[in-house]
Amino acid sequence: MTILGVDLGTTNSLAVVYKEGKPVLIPNAYGEYVTPSAVSILDGKIVVGKLAKERLITHPECSASLFKRNMGTDVTYALDKKEYDAATLSSFVVKQLIEDAQNYLHESIDEVVISVPAYFNARQRQDTKRIGELLGIKVERLINEPSAAAIACHMDDEYETFVVFDFGGGTLDVSVVDCFENVISINAISGNNHLGGTDFDRAMSEYFCFKNGLNYNVLDSSFQQSILRACEQAKIRLSTQSVVEVSLVCLLY
């Protein structure tokens, strides 16, 4: 029996299994280890990941992302005139990760472990567990994301304290974690469920529009997504470059 570990992220997700004493990352159909946490409806069928993220630009009316931010709430997303809650959309992402794992491993996946932010409340955790019910699989457990990070870093039996700084695409989480032997204890947590890399993308997009005489808030969804994508790529390039240029051909039409 193979248990799949799932890092269900706000903007990206990935899966891993433990084989022969070490973790093995699962590639998706594109050979990539990271799958965008995006969902879209194409010809009446659910598509997840890279294609869905692209369709946020071309078909925003039937695509969604960042839904993890609304786990444990009554917020729904209208995709192709049908309403989906955050847990249902998240289940589509997990289903895709399971299918990728089964294709890669040639094994059946019946159980998953899903990581969640340490600050998730009871309703948010229950919503995450509901993913298993929607897919007909067992959620063996939920593991706090800082605990998972500490386990990866804690290599011996000595007492250690870590500060886990998790600045993701959609959230910021900071935790103080104590480790001793096989015991992981989270002593303090703080964070912001609505601050992440996508918010930097949004700020850059608004500034780009301001500098070019545009009002970001009145642009249609496709325009906004095009600008967001260009600014996201610029942000990534700024990790290795001091200056980058953002240009959009679509603004000429």
Question: How does the language model describe each region?
Answer:
Residues 1-73, 77-83, 92, 99-252:
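Oxyanion-binding/catalytic loops of NTP- or PPi-dependent enzymes
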